[in-house]
Amino acid sequence: MFSKKNLKWLSVLATVIMAFVQLGGALVTKTGSADGCGSDWPLCHGAFLPQNLPIQTLIELSHRAVSGLSLIVVLWLVIVAWKHIGYIKEVKPLSCISVGFLLIQALVGAAAVMWQQNAYVLALHFGISLISFSSVFVLTLIIYEVDRKYEADELFIRKPLRIYTWIMALIVYMTIYTGALVRHKEASLAYGQWPLPFNDLMPHNVQDWVNLTHRGMALIAFIWILITFIHAVNNYRENRTIRYGYTAAFILVILQVTTGALSIITEVNLFIALLHALFITLLFGLIAYFIILMLRTIRSGG
């Protein structure tokens, strides 16, 4: 059960389950299923499995089940990784972050159900779970020795790209928070057409301001990732990790902006909304890997 041969498939399983936790959370919010079990937690309407199962209750129960399963699988992965590859410097910190933020995520989710937190607190839930996902994702990359295959273990990231990337991480996280706030404030269709309601540009209420702020942050994120991508590709032509990684980040932000626009155009089509959540999850996981690479450079005296 805890042998090294289980490490690779277990890391993939943990990453996939954590991705489903992200999508499940988005699905709960988009379908208005947060109150699907009333104010009971961990029970649902006072029972382990209530007899009456409307779609909102089923969605909320499924999300809780997947979240519980993710904790079991991630704990299993962490124990195996700690035991067999704990000598790799990043493994133990990533393991602690994975479990720690998964527990915080569960507590915030439980508090939201039991005490009806306001939208600004609820918006933190998605960002917290993203940190846990990213830790598991990066741990998986390390387990599969992606570093060695793409010479990332010998990579030296110079200061300009490190600055670009730190700022990119901050901007993307702020964009994620404002996006989650849009969902929890039920502001997805506020502030009119995309990209702007040119016939009436002035926001009229809180929902309009929240939506406009998210659109502004998304634009800043797109421009900054484009600038960072151009710098990375032009200055690290010989390094596949940088070239492929930052190209993937730029592609993901294009997909993110596209699905964001389509969400408004289609009046929040559920499939497009879930793709929107998936692309930002993958983008943040990739940025987390960039951060690990930068920390290695700093640790080596760069």
From Swiss-Prot:
Residues 1-8, 89-93, 144-161, 237-244, 293-302 are cytoplasmic. Residues 30-67, 115-122, 183-215, 266-271 are extracellular. Its main location: membrane. The chain crosses the membrane at residues 9-29, 68-88, 94-114, 123-143, 162-182, 216-236, 245-265, 272-292. Its EC number is 1.17.99.9. InterPro entries: COX15/CtaA_fam, COX15/CtaA_HemeA_synthase, HemeA_Synthase_type1. Coiled coil: none annotated. One of its GO terms (cellular component) is plasma membrane. Its cofactor is heme b. GO terms for molecular function: metal ion binding; oxidoreductase activity, acting on NAD(P)H, heme protein as acceptor. Keywords: Cell membrane, Disulfide bond, Heme biosynthesis, Iron, Membrane, Metal-binding, Oxidoreductase, Transmembrane, Transmembrane helix. Heme b binds at H214, H276. It comes from the Bacteria. It is a multi-pass membrane protein. Disulfide bonds join C37-C44. It catalyses: Fe(II)-heme o + 2 A + H2O = Fe(II)-heme a + 2 AH2. The active site is at E60. One of its GO terms (biological process) is heme A biosynthetic process. Catalyzes the conversion of heme O to heme A by two successive hydroxylations of the methyl group at C8. The first hydroxylation forms heme I, the second hydroxylation results in an unstable dihydroxymethyl group, which spontaneously dehydrates, resulting in the formyl group of heme A. Interacts with CtaB. Belongs to the COX15/CtaA family. Type 1 subfamily. The N-half (TM1-TM4) and C-half (TM5-TM8) domains are connected by an intracellular loop. Each domain is formed from four-helix bundles and they align in a pseudo twofold symmetry manner. The N-half domain is the substrate-heme O binding domain and the C-half domain is the cofactor heme B binding domain. This is Heme A synthase. It comes from Staphylococcus saprophyticus subsp. saprophyticus (strain ATCC 15305 / DSM 20229 / NCIMB 8711 / NCTC 7292 / S-41).
